[in-house]
A protein has these predicted regions:
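Short, well-ordered beta-strand segments in beta-rich or mixed alpha/beta enzyme
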Residues: 26-34, 63-95
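N-terminal targeting signals for Sec/Tat export/insertion, comprising classic cleavable signal peptides
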Residues: 27-53
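Positively charged n-region of N-terminal signal peptides that target proteins for export
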Residues: 1-4
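An amphipathic, aromatic/His-enriched active-site/gating alpha helix that lines ligand/cofactor pockets
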Residues: 21-22, 49-62, 82-119
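Short, solvent-exposed loop/turn elements at domain surfaces
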Residues: 39-42, 55-56, 90, 126-128
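Glycine-rich beta-strand-turn "strand-cap" elements at beta-sheet edges
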Residues: 15-28, 65-73, 101-128
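Enrichment for repetitive, rod-forming helical segments
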Residues: 9-10, 36, 125
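Bacterial N-terminal signal peptides
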Residues: 6-14
C-alpha cells in the first residue's frame, strides 16, 4: 500500500498548479492520513480550518493542495504544501523536517498517525 501512496503522491505532485510552484527548486511537502468515511467530512472541515489555513499564512509557503479519495470505507487525505526552499520548511517544522506535525485533534480522527512526511523538489508544474 505504501508504494501505491508514493506513486499517487508523485502523480499528484506532478499535477500541482503552476501558481503554487512557479520557480524551479521549490519544495513540495506531502502528508498523508486516513480517516473512516463516517468522519471524513468533519475531518476535512477541521483540516482546512486548523491546518491548511494556518500553513498558507506561514512565510515561505507558496500554497497548498488537498486531495481526497474514498475507498473501502476509508477516506485518504493527501496535503501537499509548496515552499520556496527547505530553509523555509525548517523555519516552520524545525530541524527534523521529516517529522509529521500533527494537529491537536488528529488522534481523534486518523486511523493511524504517520510519523513522517515526504519532500520532493518541484521540477515542473503545468496544469491547465
Amino acid at each position: 500500500m505504501r508504494n501505491a501512496i508514493i506513486a499517487t503522491v508523485l502523480l499528484l505532485t506532478a499535477c500541482a498548479t503552476a501558481h503554487h510552484a512557479e520557480s524551479p527548486g521549490a519544495v513540495a511537502r506531502m502528508w498523508h492520513g486516513r480517516v473512516p468515511d463516517a468522519r471524513a467530512a468533519e475531518y476535512e472541515d477541521y483540516l482546512r480550518r486548523e491546518g491548511i489555513t494556518k500553513l498558507e499564512a506561514i512565510p515561505g509557503n507558496l500554497g497548498v493542495d488537498l486531495f481526497t479519495r474514498s475507498r473501502d470505507g476509508v477516506t485518504e487525505f493527501i496535503v501537499i504544501s509548496y515552499w520556496h526552499s527547505l530553509d523555509d520548511i525548517k523555519a516552520y517544522a524545525g530541524a527534523d523536517i521529516e517529522k509529521t506535525h500533527n494537529l491537536p485533534r488528529d488522534p481523534e480522527f486518523l486511523i493511524e498517525l504517520e510519523p513522517n512526511v515526504r519532500h520532493f523538489t518541484v521540477k515542473m508544474s503545468n496544469r491547465k
